[in-house]
Amino acid sequence: MDLWRVFLTLALAVSSDMFPGSGATPATLGKASPVLQRINPSLRESSSGKPRFTKCRSPELETFSCYWTEGDDHNLKVPGSIQLYYARRIAHEWTPEWKECPDYVSAGANSCYFNSSYTSIWIPYCIKLTTNGDLLDEKCFTVDEIVQPDPPIGLNWTLLNISLPGIRGDIQVSWQPPPSADVLKGWIILEYEIQYKEVNETKWKTMSPIWSTSVPLYSLRLDKEHEVRVRSRQRSFEKYSEFSEVLRVTFPQMDTLAACEEDFRFPWFLIIIFGIFGVAVMLFVVIFSKQQRIKMLILPPVPVPKIKGIDPDLLKEGKLEEVNTILGIHDNYKPDFYNDDSWVEFIELDIDDADEKTEESDTDRLLSDDQEKSAGILGAKDDDSGRTSCYDPDILDTDFHTSDMCDGTSEFAQPQKLKAEADLLCLDQKNLKNSPYDASLGSLHPSITLTMEDKPQPLLGSETESTHQLPSTPMSSPVSLANIDFYAQVSDITPAGGVVLSPGQKIKAGLAQGNTQLEVAAPCQENYSMNSAYFCESDAKKCIAAAPHMEATTCVKPSFNQEDIYITTESLTTTARMSETADTAPDAEPVPDYTTVHTVKSPRGLILNATALPLPDKKKFLSSCGYVSTDQLNKIMQ
């Protein structure tokens, strides 16, 4: 509803301006709402044409003044035609007496001045305007409510510092409180508001109210002129005083180049935008061109199995047998099993079990006919479960060939015949058990340990048949039993890794005790089992040492016609020296000679290094390589 009245009032005002001679306008404005008159006092003045109060102010809370307008009536413009009356309320009651204004001149025209004699603080005042007894306007207030101090005076500024580039500077603005306000005694407390701007600007920059009379202004451009103004008000009140005079701040002349640099602002924002866009484009191009490589870096493929000499397709197809075959061919892929091998403390000879007695033993095949022995030696069986065996045909070929070259001979014999003849060198110990020479043999072979499986095997033919066939052989009286061990016990291991062997023989404990028929044979005709390519040292010693003690009629010297069977010269040297001292000390045991493995000539053959003793002068050996032939052995035995 009020909005319609506002619009109506505005329309009437415009019409009054357009038609100044109209007499209906004052009557209409007189009916306007008092709310509109409070909103716009000028409307109230123009509506009635009567004088109205404009303001009342006290600059220092000790005196105050009130002001009014003249009005439209020319008769009221005559001095003294309008009177101001005031009254004070004491003890919550108005005095019945109204008093006229004490001073119409000191505050100016159309005003009334109340000095300190007529001013009372915290006491309400009521004032009214009258002309010829008619009430024109009235107003009520207290002095503390109308306090409006004078503007500050004495504005000044001081330069604090200048920035390093010489573009901006800091100043401090100071002023004095209005002289009318008794600020020093604390009768009134003022606060100040500062406004500043550049000369060419239209909008003032306002700072927060402060209580002090100085304030710093920062970052003012040195190439611009600035304006500063200040106004004051009583603390906790809303009415400010008028602004002080404008203070102009002009800095000294500065470098033009610095001003140009300040005016030029680098477009950092645009550069950042274009930079981000360019980096995004470059990343997109790189990712698009290198997408395969980036994919491999992020998700690397599973590596293809690459083994030298093996087709990867075999692994993909799962053909493990072919892969294992290829790995077995290449030496680099073969596993090293030698680290898992354990040391062998002593060597055992595995003889066939009792249920295999029907089969012929290797030694019996050797003692049979040449045709049978040659056929049997090819079928020799090595059933030692991985341990070294004396029944090794490969050693015969290698060792005999080496000894032939050392002796300067070039005879080559069949391995079957050589093993058969070498086997005839050692006689059966069972038939010599009751002979005088039996004790000496037992004392010479204490170092070989026989296994529980060592059992005597029957000969290829019967004992009777073999007895009748003995005279036709080169040896005089071979014995049927040939299960005599020619193994050497390992006694020590050298720091360099060599194996030290202890030679010797021990008569088997499981020999049959019931044989009464003894064959007469010379001690040098023992049935040596020549299943290896060398003579045992202890056997050679027994043949040499026992020869002087036997009767000439019963001793048939062995004739070693096998030119490819050898024994070591060191062993013969030792046994020869022992045979010389047999007369003086017939019961003394020869000191066993220890030897070491010199080298491996074949997968199952060994060459031994024996401890050699000085040879007697009367025994001259033609071979210097450590082996002698059967001819040389015959000469030594003579």
UniProtKB/Swiss-Prot annotation:
Tissues with expression: Highest expression in liver. Also expressed in heart, kidney and muscle.
Keywords: Cell membrane, Disulfide bond, Endocytosis, Glycoprotein, Membrane, Phosphoprotein, Receptor, Secreted, Signal, Transmembrane, Transmembrane helix, Ubl conjugation
Motif extent (UbE motif): 341-350
Signal peptide: 1-18
Motif annotated as Box 1 motif, chain positions: 298-306
Motif (WSXWS motif): 240-244
Topology, Extracellular side: 19-265
Membrane topology category: Single-pass type I membrane protein
Topology feature Cytoplasmic, residues: 290-638
Glycosylation sites: 115, 156, 161, 200
Phosphotyrosine modified-residue sites: 487, 594
Keyword Isomerase in annotation: no
Segments for region (Disordered): 357-389
Main location: membrane
PANTHER family in UniProt: CYTOKINE RECEPTOR, INTERLEUKIN 5 RECEPTOR SUBUNIT ALPHA
Protein name, entry field: Growth hormone receptor
The species this protein was found in: Rattus norvegicus (Rat)
Organism classification: Eukaryota, Metazoa, Chordata, Craniata, Vertebrata
Gene name of this polypeptide: Ghr
